[in-house]
Amino acid sequence: MQWFGGNVATAIQISRKNKALLIVYITTDSEDGQIFDGFWQHIDSSNLLCAVVGIKLKAGETSAQQFADIYPTPILPAAYLIDQNGKPLEVITPLVGKTYDQFRAKFDKATAQFVNGMPTAAANQLSTPSPSPAPVQVPASTDAPIPAPTPVTAPIQSSSTSQEMTRELAEKVARAKALLEQKKQKDAEKKREADKHVKEEMTKAREAKQERDAEALVKAAKQRKMEKLAAESDKKRILAQIKADREAAQKKFGKLVNTENASENTEKKQETTVGKAVPSDRCRLQVRLPDGSTFVEEFPSNDVLNSLVEIIRQKPSIAGTTFEIQQPYPRRIFTNDDYSKTFLENQLTPSTALVVIQKSSGSSSNYGSFSLSTQTVSFVTWVLYPLTAFWNIFCGMIGWNSTGKQQDSKSKKNDGPSTSGQSGSQPQRRGMPRSAEVRRRGNVAGLENPNEDDPEERASFNGNSTQFM
């Protein structure tokens, strides 16, 4: 393929002037660009159905960018086959022309479409090959004027030749259509096979997932069952270990008894049994007296309790009173019979705490002595009464008024506290005259002025300052 050396605008003008097919090829440095360059080298422009004007552009150049503004070129390399009206008849890219056969089929289809779209006379003229075609040479500089190409003259062929060419072109077109139809059918079949394969794969994947889920559920159920069995076995083992430890402990301390009998005995037994005394040589006692003081004494175990009683009687707070000795726990009150028993017999060994409690007989004896002293004083007063009478008569005869003095002193004593009490209990109120006297009867108070004898001044008022008769 021989390429035009000018720019795109000049190539368009020449193609329209010569009624030729315009080919714009945009190449790249990639592998696809090199393949397309090889395809164009196999095409002989002198052996085509119509005249062509081809221009080769480099991707990234200014001319290629200007052409891309009119005809977008998203995929490169690309070849645009454009008719006289500027309409692309075919766009050949690596997507549709990966092999030379595909590339040539697209190219032949575009040339045939270009020839069929032209008038018959022009088509016959263009379809007749020239004996010595000469490519149009244009200088590389775009500033120089481009001379018009020399028109190619071809001898007029016979009608049989034109019919053969038309028939050959129709056969090529039919063959190209058949190939395209076969290709479409093959592509559709491949697509159906691919869709079928995808559906089969999806079905297999779904079935495999369901199987995996079912296996996971079965495995989880088995795992839970095993865990449950393990937990039950551990529980039984722990209970058995606890039971064995309990039996061992009971055997060790001699307390292996029946559980049911022990519970029944525990419910029935409400009183605490008193343990037996521990035999010992000495008995240590802590005694608490009624005043709160305590003391500690130690006796031989074979000594009697009366020894402790004698020591308690010598205490100052107990001297001259009656008392009794009690044991707080277990609760016990010692009697006179217990005083003659030993500490061991009274179960007080080796040590015990005792409490001394005073009896109420001491208060009755004091009351009796108090009544006795009162009777004695009354008797003495009755005996001395005549002497007192004679003394008062003698003092009256002499002029000594002992009774009056006593009465005056008594009255002074009585007046003093009462006056002070009244003055203290009734302080003087602000705004009231000293001569005013208040008469109060319950919740009713009356004001009286001793200096004036006015009935209105003796008016009575209740607690709400309301006057009433």
Curated annotation (Swiss-Prot):
Superkingdom assignment: Eukaryota
Induction: Induced upon ER stress. Down-regulated upon heat stress.
GO CC annotations, alphabetized: endoplasmic reticulum; endoplasmic reticulum membrane
Residue span of region Disordered: 181-212, 404-469
Biased composition (Low complexity): 416-430
Function: Probably acts as an adapter for ATPase cdc-48.1 and/or cdc-48.2, conferring substrate specificity. May play a role in the ER-associated protein degradation pathway (ERAD) possibly acting as a platform to recruit both ubql-1 and cdc-48.1 and/or cdc-48.2 to the ER during ERAD.
Subcellular location: Endoplasmic reticulum membrane
UniProt-listed InterPro entries: Ubiquitin-like_domsf, UBX_dom
Cysteines joined through disulfide linkages: none
Record field: intramembrane: 379-399
UBX domain: residues covered: 278-356
Subunit structure: Interacts with cdc-48.1 (via N-terminus) and cdc-48.2 (via N-terminus).
Domain comment as written in the entry: The intramembrane domain also contains the signal for ER targeting.
Cytoplasmic-side positions: 1-378, 400-469
Protein name: UBX domain-containing protein 4
Effects seen without this gene: RNAi-mediated knockdown causes a reduction in lifespan. Induces ER stress characterized by the expression of hsp-4, the accumulation of ubiquitinated proteins and an increase in ubql-1 expression.
Known tissue expression: Expressed in the germline.
A biological-process GO annotation: response to unfolded protein
Pfam families for this protein: UBX (PF00789), UBX7_N (PF23187)
SMART domains hit by this protein: UBX (SM00166)
UniProt keywords, alphabetically: Coiled coil, Endoplasmic reticulum, Membrane, Unfolded protein response
Highest classification ranks of the organism: Eukaryota, Metazoa, Ecdysozoa, Nematoda, Chromadorea
Membrane topology category: Peripheral membrane protein
